[in-house]
Amino acid sequence: MESVVQPSVFVVDGQTDIPFRRLEQNHRRRRCGTVQVSLALVLLLGAGLATQGWFLLRLHQRLGDIVAHLPDGGKGSWEKLIQDQRSHQANPAAHLTGANASLIGIGGPLLWETRLGLAFLRGLTYHDGALVTMEPGYYYVYSKVQLSGVGCPQGLANGLPITHGLYKRTSRYPKELELLVSRRSPCGRANSSRVWWDSSFLGGVVHLEAGEEVVVRVPGNRLVRPRDGTRSYFGAFMV
């Protein structure tokens, strides 16, 4: 009779859940590692914000110390600068041009354009060639005239120069007073057949009272060339 072979059977009595416990421990370790990394990042961010706040606080304190040591006038320096700029913009000023066809007055001062092109009046008035001040003070007055002719002008051959001058009219004196005068002659470089060109510029600071007038005179006014208003001009502004 044939014998039957039975398979071997092994019986384990305890610790049947060891593999499952190991898997659970690995998951817990991973979760703890993630929490630790997140906490470290939060701590670094907090430290950075704290450092930045400390530097800003120190900067604010240093600026406060600097301002505290400034003189009283220094605290309002920017306001004073702005006020000065505004006051300069409001100062009396005028620029007149020679673009007007009536530039040359017969027997009188040169006449000027007050509105067209670059010409303007601000805080000053104009009357028959004269700039009239409305406020007393120091003014920079200036004038430029473009001169032209053919050969030596009649009357200059004897050595008399062309006179270009700024003159003041005041109620305290019966005659015009010289402020600035230039004298020049083209006869040394001109002959009877050639056209010559020349220019004269005057400028300086003078004191004027309210109501006083400043005019420009060129006795040989037929030599003045108005042109386009940029060659001959007259102006003043308070300094």
Swiss-Prot record:
It is a single-pass type II membrane protein. CDD domains: TNF. InterPro entries: TNF, TNF_dom, Tumour_necrosis_fac-like_dom. Residues 92-239 form the THD domain. GO terms for cellular component: extracellular space; plasma membrane. Residues 1-37 are cytoplasmic. PANTHER family: TUMOR NECROSIS FACTOR FAMILY MEMBER, TUMOR NECROSIS FACTOR LIGAND SUPERFAMILY MEMBER 14. Residues 59-239 are extracellular. GO terms for molecular function: cysteine-type endopeptidase inhibitor activity involved in apoptotic process; cytokine activity; signaling receptor binding; tumor necrosis factor receptor binding. Cytokine that binds to TNFRSF3/LTBR. Binding to the decoy receptor TNFRSF6B modulates its effects. Activates NFKB and stimulates the proliferation of T-cells. Acts as a ligand for TNFRSF14/HVEM. Upon binding to TNFRSF14/HVEM, delivers costimulatory signals to T cells, leading to T cell proliferation and IFNG production. Homotrimer. Interacts with TNFRSF14. The record marks 81-82 as: Cleavage. It is found in: Cell membrane. The soluble form derives from the membrane form by proteolytic processing. This is Tumor necrosis factor ligand superfamily member 14. The chain crosses the membrane at residues 38-58. Glycans are attached at residues 100, 191. The gene is Tnfsf14. PROSITE patterns: THD_2.
